Amino acid sequence: MASAFVAQAVPPEQIVYEDRFQSLENWVAEMEQPGTASVRAGVLTIDVPAGCTLWFKPELSSPVRIEYEATMIAAGGPNDRVSDLNCFWMATDARAPGDFFAARRSGKFGDYNQLRAYYVGQGGNSNTTTRFRRYIGDPVLRPLLPEHDLKDPTVLLTPNVPQRIRLLAQGSTIRYSNNGRLIFDFYDSRPYTRGRFGFRTTRSHVELRNFRVYRPRTR
């Protein structure tokens, strides 16, 4: 008798959070200098003259995938520099392990050295570098491996073009992708398994859309 093969249905991925940007109630802004973070018609616009980090309030836990669309605006405005499409994920603060938002951070980049987090700075240094770092909670050291210090023009920013960002923290697998291209694929033997997501930029003008957090399938 021939044996029957029964296909197992693959469960859909779970959307843990979704923000359609009708308000800023899910976000905490840290700005080095006065700037603008505003929402309108499903778009979150950040227009700032200096450093700015916008933290998503809920704590996330691994496995997790974070997706959003970002457009670096170049339309002649004072901050339209096209630089620093940056982000933290799985971030905790060594100064306040029990309450992430109890630590004082001004938006100045140096204030984030004591995070434990994954970080990508795409198009940093006036759109000349794209870097991945694993922050270790040290006030001085921010380790940077040579293979995570990229300067190829194909991994830099293009003005006024939507960039679909995908971040993954799934066990020891840490990844960063842009428009379907895997840019960083990092194996972490001691992975960060919980923490916050933060969008980071400095002296730039950016529009964010379609922010979603997924619980990826596990095999």
Stretches found by the model and what they are:
Residues M1-S3:
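Sec-dependent N-terminal signal peptides
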Residues F5-R219:
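Extracellular glycan-recognition regions
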